[in-house]
C-alpha cells in the first residue's frame, strides 16, 4: 500500500512538474521520459521512505475486521442514513399536508418498496402518511387543530394563537392569477439533471430554483412549458456517457409546488383535521382523506396498508379453499403464497383506492398523469369558497360519506393491491422453491448413495445426471443429429457409432446397477421382516407373561376371599360344636375300622341339636336301640341310660379328633338339610359295630368308653340283665313296627347336613389330646335322670328324634348312629329316599 501510494505521489509530482514546465517554457528531453520513476534519485528516496514506512507499520499489526463486524457496521450506516433521510423528508417534502415516510406507528421492518410507494403517493393514488392524533375532540378551535397537526402541544381554547398560526395569508401568495396549476412548472434550462440521478427512487432535492414563492416566477402557457422541457431532452440526448439514458428520459420528474400553507383562508392543518376520522385497525385519528378498501369500502390508513402482505411461502396443504389444479404434476409439491386478504371481509386480492383532497400542495410530477392532465384548477388561499367544483372524476372533492355500493375488481386501474407495493413476492417464492428443490435433491442423493455398491460409486453421478435429463436417448428429437451439418458422412457415421457404443455401455451399467439396487432392497425388506417378526414374538411373550401374572394374582385373590368366607361362616373350621365333632368322629371311626366309605351319599354327618322350645319337656329319645347320653352337672352314665361301651384306642381317637373340631349350626341358611344323612350315619355305625364283634384285622378296640360309664345299666326298664352294647343292631323292619305304636312322640329336630370335605380342617398334633379331652367331656353327663324307655319307632320321613333335656343342660346332647347296612339291591337302596314306604322293604342284617 505504501509503495503504491508513493508511486502515485511520484506520478502526481511528475505530472505537476510537467505541467509547470509546459506553462513556463520549453521542456528538456528528460522531462518527456515515459518512465520517470526508473530514473532520478527521487524515486530511490520514495522507495526508501516506503520501506521505512512499511517497517513502522509492521511493528503494530492491525486487527482484521470480521465479516460480522463489517455487516454490523454496514447496517449501522444504513440505519443512520435512513434516519437522516427521514428527517430531511419530513422537513422538506410533503404531499397535500402528508408525508412520504412512515410516522412510526409500527416499529417492525419496512419491507415494502419505498420507491413505488413514494411514486403512488405523489401520483395521488395512495394516501400519504398523515400525522396521527392520539386524541381528538370535535370542538377544537382552529389554532388547536394547527398545533395538533404540527405535533405541538395543544394550547387552551381561549389562548391567543401565535403570529405564525394566526397569519391568514402568505406575503408572496397574494397574486390571484398565479394560482393556476397548469402554470406551476418552472424553467429548468438553467438546471440540468445530474448523471447520478436515481431514477428508481425518483427523488429530487429541494433547490432554490423550485421555490416559486417569488412573484417573478414565469407564468406561461402549456405549450411554453413544453418548449421549456426541450433543452432538457437535448441535453440528455447529447450525453453519451450516460449508462441508462432511456430510463432517465422515461422516469417522471418531481417538482415542488408553491409553498402555500393556507386553504380557503385557513391553515392547511385546520382544513385537514377539522373532520378527523379514526382508523379501525391502528385506532389513530387521521384526516378524512384515507384509503378505501376495494371490496367493502372501509377506511384504512397507509401505515396499516403497507404492513399487509402475502404470507411467507409454505406448503399448500395448510390453507382452506382448494387451489386450481396445476399444469404439471410436480407443481403439487411446490410452495405457495396466497394473496393477502382484506382485514375486514377476508376477501382475497386486497386492494385500496384513494380520493385526494380538493387541493394540491407539495410534490408533483412534471409530466402529469391522466388525472393531473384532466385537473382544471386547484383551490388556493385566494380561491373563493364558491368556486366551481373539480370536473375530474378521480380527483373530485368529497361531498358526503356515502359508501360505494359495489366492489371494484382487483385489476381496476384505480385499485392498488398489496402485490403492487411488494413486486418481489414472486422472486421470493421462486427462491424458496429453489431452496426446497436443492434440499430435496440433496436428500435424494444421500438416500440413493445408501443403496449404491462400492464398486459402482465412481460413475454414479455421471449416469444419474445423464439419465435424469434424458440426454442418452437415441431419437433425433432429443439429440443434435437431426440438425443438418457440413461434416463428412464418414466422420458422422463414426461419431454415431461411438456414441451408440457409449450409450449401450451406459445402458448396461444402468441395468446392472438397477439389479444390484433391487437385490439390496429385497435383502433389506427381508431383514426388516425378520426384525418385525422378532419384535412381534417378544411382544406376544410379554403379553402372555403379563396375562399369566394377572390370572395368578386373580386366582390368589379369589382363594383368599374364599378362605376368608369359610372362616367367617358358621360351618367353618373355627367353631367348637361338640355335636359336629362327635358326628365327624363317628363317621371317621366307621371308615377307619371297616376300611370302606360310602361314596354315593351327598353328606356323611348327622347331628341333633336341642332348640330352646324343647328345654322344659321331658327327655325322650328315639333311635335304633341306641341310648342318648344325658349331660348333667353330676351323675354317671348309668343314670342317664348310656349303654356300656368299650374303650377306644387313644391313638385312634386322637387321629380322629384331629380333623373334627367344629360343628355347623343347624340354623345356617346356606347349607340345605339332607335327611338322608341318617342312613349314612347308620351305615357308618353298623360298620363300626361289625368291626367291634371281631372283624377288625388289627385287633384294636372298637368301642368308645367314657369316664364314669359302667358296663351295666341298673335302671333298664326293659328288664335287660346285662349291659347293652352301645352299638346294638336290630332289624330295620322290627324298628319300623315298633315305631307304629309310638306315633305320638315328640317332634324331632334334624340338623342340616354338610359336606365332610367342606367342614374338615386338620389341626396340629400337639393339640390332638386336648381336642380329645374336650370331645370326651361332652359325653360325660352331670345329672342322672331316669332312663327313658327306648322306643324303636322310626318315622316315615327318616327323621331321628332328638332327646329332651331340661334347662340346666348347657352342651347339646349327641346321637351317634354308626350303623352300616349290608349290601342292598338298587330297589332297596332307593327306599331311603324321602316319602318311600319302608314297611314293605326288608333289610338284611349283618350277621357274624
UniProtKB/Swiss-Prot annotation:
**Annotated spans, Disordered:** 1-67, 154-260, 312-332, 378-411, 466-518, 541-582, 595-800, 813-848
Q: Which residue stretches does the UniProt record annotate as biased composition, category Polar residues?
A: 168-203, 477-500, 571-582, 648-670, 692-713
- Which positions are tagged coiled coil? none
* Residue ranges, compositional bias (Low complexity): 204-218, 239-250, 378-393, 679-691, 833-848
In this chain, composition skew of type Basic and acidic residues spans: 1-13, 501-518, 541-569, 736-764, 779-794
Name the UniProt key words of this record, in alphabetical order: Cytoplasm
Location of this chain's protein in the cell: Cytoplasm
Give me the Gene Ontology terms describing cellular component. cytoplasm
Q: Which family does it belong to?
A: Belongs to the SIP5 family.
Instruction: Tell me, in a sentence or two, what this protein's role is.
Output: May negatively regulate the snf1 kinase.
This chain's protein is named: Protein sip5
Q: Which organism is it from?
A: Botryotinia fuckeliana (strain B05.10) (Noble rot fungus)
Amino acid at each position: 500500500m505504501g509503495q503504491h501510494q508513493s508511486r502515485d505521489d511520484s506520478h502526481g509530482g511528475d505530472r505537476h512538474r510537467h505541467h509547470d514546465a509546459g506553462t513556463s517554457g520549453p521542456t528538456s528531453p528528460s522531462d518527456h521520459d515515459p518512465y520517470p520513476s526508473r530514473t532520478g534519485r527521487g524515486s530511490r528516496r520514495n522507495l526508501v521512505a516506503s520501506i521505512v514506512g512499511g517497517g513502522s507499520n509492521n511493528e503494530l499489526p492491525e486487527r482484521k475486521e470480521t465479516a460480522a463486524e463489517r455487516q454490523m457496521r454496514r447496517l449501522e450506516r444504513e440505519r443512520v442514513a435512513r434516519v437522516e433521510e427521514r428527517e430531511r423528508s419530513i422537513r422538506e417534502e410533503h404531499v397535500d399536508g402528508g408525508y412520504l415516510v412512515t410516522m412510526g406507528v409500527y416499529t417492525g421492518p419496512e419491507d415494502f418498496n419505498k420507491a413505488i410507494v413514494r411514486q403512488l403517493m405523489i401520483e395521488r393514488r395512495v394516501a400519504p402518511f398523515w400525522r396521527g392524533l392520539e386524541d381528538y375532540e370535535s370542538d377544537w378551535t382552529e389554532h388547536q387543530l394547527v398545533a395538533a397537526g404540527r405535533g405541538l402541544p395543544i394550547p387552551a381554547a381561549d389562548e391567543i394563537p401565535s403570529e405564525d398560526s394566526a397569519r391568514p395569508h402568505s406575503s408572496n401568495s397574494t397574486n390571484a392569477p398565479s394560482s393556476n396549476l397548469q402554470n406551476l412548472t418552472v424553467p429548468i434550462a438553467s438546471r440540468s439533471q445530474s448523471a447520478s440521478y436515481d431514477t428508481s427512487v425518483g427523488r429530487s432535492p429541494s433547490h432554490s430554483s423550485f421555490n416559486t414563492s417569488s412573484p417573478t416566477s414565469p407564468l406561461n402557457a402549456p405549450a411554453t412549458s413544453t418548449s421549456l422541457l426541450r433543452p432538457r431532452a437535448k441535453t440528455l440526448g447529447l450525453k453519451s456517457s450516460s449508462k441508462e439514458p432511456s430510463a432517465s428520459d422515461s422516469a417522471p420528474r418531481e417538482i415542488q409546488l408553491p409553498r402555500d400553507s393556507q386553504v380557503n383562508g385557513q391553515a392547511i392543518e385546520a382544513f385537514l383535521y377539522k373532520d378527523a376520522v379514526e382508523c379501525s385497525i391502528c385506532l389513530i385519528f387521521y384526516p378524512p382523506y384515507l384509503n378505501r378498501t376495494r371490496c367493502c369500502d372501509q377506511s384504512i390508513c397507509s401505515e396499516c396498508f403497507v404492513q399487509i402482505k402475502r404470507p411467507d411461502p409454505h406448503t399448500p396443504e395448510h390453507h382452506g379453499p382448494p387451489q386450481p389444479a396445476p399444469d404439471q404434476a410436480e407443481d403439487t409439491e411446490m410452495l405457495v403464497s396466497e394473496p393477502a386478504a382484506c382485514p375486514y371481509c377476508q376477501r382475497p386480492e386486497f386492494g385500496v383506492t384513494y380520493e385526494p383532497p380538493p387541493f394540491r400542495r407539495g410534490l408533483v410530477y412534471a409530466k402529469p398523469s391522466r388525472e393531473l392532465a384532466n385537473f382544471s384548477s386547484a383551490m388556493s388561499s385566494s380561491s373563493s369558497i364558491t368556486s366551481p367544483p373539480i370536473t375530474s372524476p378521480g380527483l373530485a372533492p368529497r361531498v358526503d360519506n356515502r359508501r360505494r355500493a359495489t366492489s371494484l375488481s382487483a385489476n381496476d386501474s384505480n385499485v392498488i393491491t398489496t402485490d403492487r407495493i411488494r413486486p418481489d413476492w414472486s422472486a421470493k417464492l421462486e427462491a424458496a422453491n429453489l431452496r426446497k428443490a436443492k434440499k430435496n435433491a440433496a436428500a435424494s442423493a444421500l438416500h440413493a448413495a445408501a443403496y449404491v455398491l462400492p464398486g459402482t460409486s465412481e460413475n454414479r453421478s455421471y449416469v444419474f445426471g445423464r439419465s435424469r435429463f434424458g440426454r442418452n436417448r437415441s431419437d433425433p428429437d432429443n439429440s443434435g443429429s437431426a440438425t443438418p451439418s457440413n461434416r463428412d458422412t464418414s466422420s458422422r457415421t463414426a461419431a454415431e457409432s461411438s456414441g451408440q457404443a457409449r450409450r449401450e455401455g451406459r445402458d448396461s451399467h444402468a441395468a446392472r446397477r438397477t439389479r444390484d439396487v433391487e437385490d439390496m432392497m429385497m435383502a433389506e425388506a427381508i431383514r426388516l421382516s425378520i426384525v418385525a417378526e422378532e419384535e412381534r414374538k417378544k411382544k406376544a411373550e410379554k403379553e402372555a407373561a403379563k396375562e399369566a401374572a394377572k390370572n395368578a394374582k386373580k386366582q390368589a385373590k379369589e382363594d383368599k376371599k374364599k378362605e376368608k368366607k369359610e372362616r367367617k361362616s358358621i360351618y367353618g373350621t373355627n367353631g367348637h360344636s361338640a355335636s359336629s365333632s362327635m358326628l365327624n368322629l363317628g363317621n371317621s371311626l366307621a371308615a377307619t375300622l371297616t376300611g370302606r366309605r360310602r361314596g354315593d351319599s351327598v353328606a356323611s354327618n348327622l347331628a341333633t341339636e336341642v332348640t330352646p322350645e324343647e328345654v322344659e319337656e321331658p327327655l325322650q329319645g328315639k333311635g335304633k336301640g341306641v341310648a342318648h347320653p344325658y349331660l348333667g352337672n353330676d351323675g354317671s352314665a348309668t343314670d342317664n341310660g348310656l349303654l356300656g361301651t368299650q374303650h377306644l384306642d387313644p391313638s385312634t381317637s386322637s387321629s380322629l379328633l384331629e380333623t373334627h373340631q367344629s360343628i355347623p349350626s343347624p340354623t345356617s341358611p346356606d347349607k340345605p338339610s339332607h335327611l338322608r344323612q341318617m342312613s349314612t350315619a347308620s351305615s357308618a355305625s353298623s360298620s363300626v359295630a361289625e368291626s367291634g364283634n371281631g372283624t377288625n384285622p388289627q385287633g384294636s378296640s372298637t368301642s368308645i368308653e367314657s369316664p364314669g360309664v359302667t358296663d351295666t345299666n341298673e335302671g333298664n326298664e326293659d328288664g335287660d340283665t346285662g349291659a347293652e352294647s352301645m352299638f346294638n343292631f336290630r332289624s330295620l323292619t322290627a324298628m319300623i313296627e315298633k315305631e307304629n305304636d309310638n306315633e305320638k312322640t315328640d317332634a324331632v329336630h334334624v340338623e342340616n347336613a354338610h359336606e365332610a370335605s367342606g367342614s374338615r380342617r386338620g389341626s396340629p398334633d400337639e393339640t390332638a389330646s386336648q381336642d380329645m379331652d374336650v370331645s370326651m367331656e361332652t359325653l360325660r353327663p352331670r345329672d342322672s335322670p331316669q332312663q327313658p324307655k327306648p322306643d324303636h319307632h322310626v318315622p316315615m320321613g327318616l327323621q331321628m328324634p332328638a332327646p329332651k333335656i331340661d334347662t340346666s343342660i348347657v352342651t347339646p346332647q349327641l346321637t351317634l348312629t354308626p350303623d352300616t347296612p349290608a349290601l342292598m339291591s338298587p330297589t332297596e337302596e332307593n327306599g331311603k329316599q324321602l316319602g318311600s314306604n319302608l314297611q314293605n322293604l326288608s333289610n338284611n342284617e349283618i350277621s357274624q
